[in-house]
Structure formats: C-alpha cells, structure tokens
Amino acid sequence: RLIRRQRQMCIRDRATSASGLFYAFQSIVQLARESGSGTYRLPEVTIEDAPRFSYRGMHLDVSRHFYTKEFVKKQIDALARYKLNRFHWHLTDGAGWRIEIKKYPELTRETAYRPFPDWKSWWNGGRTYCRQDAPGASGGYYTQEDVKEIVEYARQRHITVIPEIEMPAHSEEVLAALPQLACGGDLKPGGEFCPGKELTYEFLTNVLKEVMELFPSEYIHIGGDEASTNHWKQCPDCQALMKAEGMKEEGELQEYLVSRIEKFLKENGRKMIGWDEILTGELDETSAVTVWRGEDKGAESVKRGLRTILSPGAYCYFDSYQDAPRTQPEAIGGYLPLEKVYSYEPVTEAFPADKLDCVWGVQGNVWTEYIPTPEHVEYMIYPRLLALAEVAWTNLEQKDWKRFHAEALQEVKVLNSMGYHTFDLQNEVGNRPVALSVDNHLAKGKKVEYVRPYSDSYPAGGESALTNGIHGGWVYTDQRWQGFLGKGADVIVDLEKSQPIQQLSIDFMQLRGPGVFLPQKVSFLISNDGKEYTLLKTITTTLPITDEQLTIQTYDWTGSCEAHYVRVQADINPEAGGFLFTDEFVVK
C-alpha cells in the first residue's frame, strides 16, 4: 500500500517482504514527473496493489545470436521496472553453446562461434561452427564469472534467473563437439542426444552440477521440446534400452531421459521445468511445465496439479511481427501486435476451478533466429513487454485497453530516453485493412462445394470459411486463412439464383519461409446449371517463388455476366509445392 499526501509518504507492505517494498518504489519511479527544476513531483495518491500471478517471466534465446553481459543486465533493469520477477535464460541450442562448463571446455571452444555473421546465413550455409580465432568468427559465450555477475545483478532486483539447458533435442552443437553422445546407425547425427547411452546421462548430470553451482534458482529448465525419434529408431543402443525397459515406442525414450534428469535434480535439491512436451510422461508433483502450444496443453498441466507457466505462441512469442510485415524487419512470421498481447487472458474455462492455484504465471519469449543485433532484440520486446507485464500483474476486471495504450505511448518515450530501442508505437500501421470489417458481398453466407478439399491442418471456418465475409489478416495462422495441399483449390459457390455479376476476386498469400506460395494460375468460371462452366479469365502468377517477402495478391475478374454458380480454381505451382492459402471468395 502506497500513500502520498502533501509532504508525507507512507509505504506499507502487508507481506513485509523486500520484494514488496521494491515494487512499491518502482511505482514511485513510474509516477514521478520531472518538474523542470531538476526535482521530481509525485501526485497525491493512494495505491493498494498486488500481483495477480507469482511467476511473471521473460525469456531470451542467446543461442541463435549471442548478446553481451551488459545487454543482458540492461534487459534485467527493464524487467525490474515493470515488476517481472523471472528471467528464463535459453543458454544452449543447436546454433551455439553459450555457457562455460569447466569439465567440457570443448563445448564453448568448438561451438560458441560460427563462420557466419547471423543465424540465417549459418542455417543456409551448412550449419558449421568454428573457433574464436577463425576468420569471420561470430558469437561468444558467458564465462562462469559472467553468469555469477548476472545472477547477482538480477537478485538485487528481485529477479530469479532460470537457466535452460536443452535436452534431448536442439543439441546439434553438443554433438558437434562431443560426437560420442550421438546415436549410432546409418543416419548422420541429428539434434538429439542418444538416450540409450549411459555416457549421455554422465554428460548431462555433470553439466547440471556446474549449472546448479552457478544458479541458486529453485527450478532448472531442461527444454524437452521438439525431439525427433528418427535416429532412435535406427540406433542399436536406443533399441537395446527399449528392450530392457519394455518400451513399445521410441517416444518413451524421451520420457525415460526426462524422468532420470528430474530424479537427479530432485536428489540435488532442485526442481525441473520443461516445455509442454514433457507432459507425455509421468512427472513428479514438484515439476513445472512451460506451456507454449496452446490452451489444451495448459489445461492438461493444470488438471494434473503441476505448476504451470502459460506462454502460448499466439500471445507470448515476441519474435513474431508486431506490425504489417512489409513495414518491419524480417521476422520468423506470425503477427502479434501490442493489443493482442494485452488481450491475453491466461485462465480459461478449460482449467478446473479447484486447480487454479496451479497456474503459476505467464511468460514472454524471444527466439532470436531473425534478430541478429541487440537493438533489434529491444525493438521486438518493447513495448510488448509492457502488455505482458500488465497481464501478469493486473486482475482482469482492472484492465482497460484504451487506458493502457495511452500510457504505453508515453512509456515508449521514457524507454527511448533511457536508451532502449523500441518499436514506433505512435506510427503503428495495424492489421490488414480488409480484415477489420465484414465484407457483405453476394456470396456471403452461401453454400460452398469443395471439389478439392481443404487441409485439415488449416480449416479456418470450415465449409463456410470462404463465404463468411471475413478476410484474413497478415498471417495464415489467424484461423481466417484456409489452406490447401495436393493440386490446390477448386471451389464452387451456389448463389441460390441466377443474378448479375460484375466482379469476382480472391486473395492468396506467399511466404516462402514456411512453404506458403501463390498459385501457379487462377481461373474464374460461371454456370447456370451447375454442370457446364464457362471460363471467364485465367490469371498466371508472375511473382517468383524465390521472393521471400510476405505477399498477399488479389486475383480478380471484372465485367458483366449472369450466373447461378461461380467457381474458382487455383493450381499449386509444381516447382514450389507447399501450401495455398486463401481467405474469401468475393462476388459482387
């Protein structure tokens, strides 16, 4: 409780905790306004405040690109300012090992540097590593003294640093330095440790021993996400372990590894966190889960009584575009504007009411594949971090987007004055204009026949998706864009009666990275009996499939005709393959 009246100020912390006092002072700092004479003034105010969630976190991937100790400390300052209290430090991944481990110096010696200036060049250029003194070497790592300094710096600001050491997947860099930890068999090494070798557990526990000496955190994050079983199927050691343990599927090997590491951490007075893939196995009640794949995984974790950190990609992945993609630096994809982050409500009806205390909190994530510089990292984080902080701290009934947006505009200026490189919120473009309103055209609400089926992976609105009057936004994952594989799309709309038509149009998307391409050609046809169709126009795509920028292209016909049925055919480019995505078949 903070009370400011005339010349008096009183701070009362019911929990009498140092963190409570610290957060009260953060409120004072945010309330203070420079008077113009070198002093600051506070308004008369009474504030009674407490956080909604006890875990309020932010994640930073330093493997894809390395950032200095000073940069990390600068971000910790911002977390403290906005009352976040966990820093999830993603220290290892296939793109580089970033923490000194004295028992295994080859980890940093051989894989902390790459002969490429950025991740994208490395990914497309052979994914090799080099030593620090090699020509063109790029990268770095944190010494154990660096780690101790950062951990202490965070502690002084009431932030717990949680290290992540990836296993069993995302470990290409380890296998490059220590190939004896890879699977046997005919396949070349992938990104997964061999869970069938006892040497793997010796390595992992030795690494974790040093990590635990550096990080006093209650929890250690072990990754656990996106493991492939391809190598395990062909590995003699993995198959021998499966036989000895009575396993039926290779996925059980991951559960076995996770269980052994969980037990090791518990024996050493620590607890385990993993990404939500660890839910496939039995977990100790002390373990926690970072949920990134959506509400159903969060509900499963909560129902099982596990501490649950909610961090869904749709709301909490700050590596997504935050504005119209063509106005922004290259990103991994997606579209996550400030308003959507702010709209996130972690607790849903899918969570059992008697287990809501298992919702530990929320976390934002910054994966840095396409974020090569410190300035770019800050650009992606701020001001979205402000929205995350309010989601984590403020009760739902107290949230107000208009109030928050006005405050965020001012806070961006403060951050800029403090040396942070923020997104230009004042000049935000926003979502795709046609996605902001309903298009009341002649085919809206009419029945659609799919001559070629849409993909079950991207159904959007199902059989009404292309005639519901709703256009898609900037990303194909917004559940407005319908996806097609195979030969492409071929749909017929029944207008219910013959009527005059002056225009037919349909949009398609191209985004080369995830394999989304414009059609090779689009044809518009009409019919009055639903059997014989007359071709109105065929349009051939001219944009090359090598173009990597997001493109949304409209294909249309204009003229004068009468028709009962309208049809559009869009053929997949055989040279490109991949998906077609479209959002609305407009008839006027």
Residues covered by each model-derived region:
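Extended acidic/polar, glycine-enriched regions
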Residues: 12-50, 67, 86
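Short proline/glycine- and polar residue-rich coil/turn motifs
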Residues: 542-549
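Single conserved hydrophobic/aromatic residue that forms the stacking wall/gate
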Residues: 1-7, 11
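Acidic, glycine-anchored loop motifs typical of Ca2+
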Residues: 440, 456-475
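Aromatic, loop-rich ligand-recognition surfaces of beta-strand-rich domains
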Residues: 472-537, 549-588
